[in-house]
Every structure is written in structure tokens, then in C-alpha cells.
Curated annotation (Swiss-Prot):
Free-text comment on this protein's domains from its UniProt entry: A long coiled coil structure formed by 3 polypeptide chains connects the central nodule to the C-terminal domains (distal nodules). The long C-terminal ends of the alpha chains fold back, contributing a fourth strand to the coiled coil structure.
Annotated protein name in UniProt: Fibrinogen alpha chain
A Gene Ontology biological process term: adaptive immune response
Gene Ontology CC, one term: extracellular region
Subcellular location, principal: secreted
Location(s) in or outside the cell: Secreted
Coiled coil: none
Length: 16
């Protein structure tokens, strides 16, 4: 996932 997406994961990510 993308950090700029919004979703915050332990690995550091984001979903748009």
C-alpha cells in the first residue's frame, strides 16, 4: 500500500 494513500500499516502503507 501507499503511505500517501491513507491506510496505515505496520510496514507503512496506504490504500487509495
Amino acid at each position: 500500500s501507499d503511505p500517501a494513500g491513507g491506510e496505515f500499516l505496520a510496514e507503512g502503507g496506504g490504500v487509495r
